[in-house]
Amino acid sequence: MRLRNGKKIEEDVVVIFDVETTGLVPKRKEYRGAKTELQSKSYYYDVPLPDFPYITQLCFVIYDLATDRVLYLYSNYVKLPEGIDISKEASEKTGITREICEEKGVPIVDALIAFYRAVHRASRIIAHNYEFDHTVISIEMKRNMKDARFRRSCPNADRILTSDYLYSRNIRTFCTMRAFTNICKIFYAGKTSGAYKWPRLEEVHHFLFGYKPENLHDAEVDVMTCLKCYLYLFSPPAPPMLG
């Protein structure tokens, strides 16, 4: 048990999260501009803010490792601003359309507030390709700082996922994609030697459990699959008894 801002927190509570978006972040080589304050700590530092994708679906689970149970599951589509479309590739991959976001989605501010509160309950936050997911959420936090309710509910939201902020609150991060790279040992297509590629979530699951899960690229499915792989890494099944 530790204290954070006078409140007790559990060492064993983790948050696993995933987002679906309107598209991919453009390649960095397409940009030559100087870093902005927001982008200075991001892997995607030289991509202009307006070119980042918008979140179409956010899911996270708060999980207690000590009791092996889900404490809270959040999963929602997110409404998009006027004039923002979902790329054909993203829609085909996820099955999410602008109509789905409009009919079933929640305001982005509501989703961000829920995520902000979840992070502050955790001792570790986890994602598959953490760099992408945390960058997209950080961008959305920055975009919505003009909303008064958001600012009141989420102090420092625009830097909540920066390494300095997380370190100051003893919150660690974990990327299953990076963690499993040297475990899965998958070479790039056509290669039989050299560096291993970063494994996709379905590749990690197949490596561990012998089959690929269905309906990936739904944020909720991705989160539960990521959680399953993470738990395997730290608590692998016991070997069968002999004799």
Residue ranges of model-derived segments:
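N-terminal accessory regions of nucleic-acid-interacting proteins
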Residues: 1-39
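Metal-dependent phosphoesterase core characteristic of DEDDh/y 3'-5' exonuclease domains
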Residues: 2-13, 52-98, 116-243
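Generic detector of short, locally flexible boundary/turn motifs and exposed helical patches
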Residues: 18, 36-43, 89-93, 192-193
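Short loop/turn and capping residues at structural boundaries
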Residues: 27, 102, 216-217
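A short alpha/beta connector and helix-capping loop motif
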Residues: 27-60
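Catalytic-core regions of hydrolytic enzymes
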Residues: 102-121
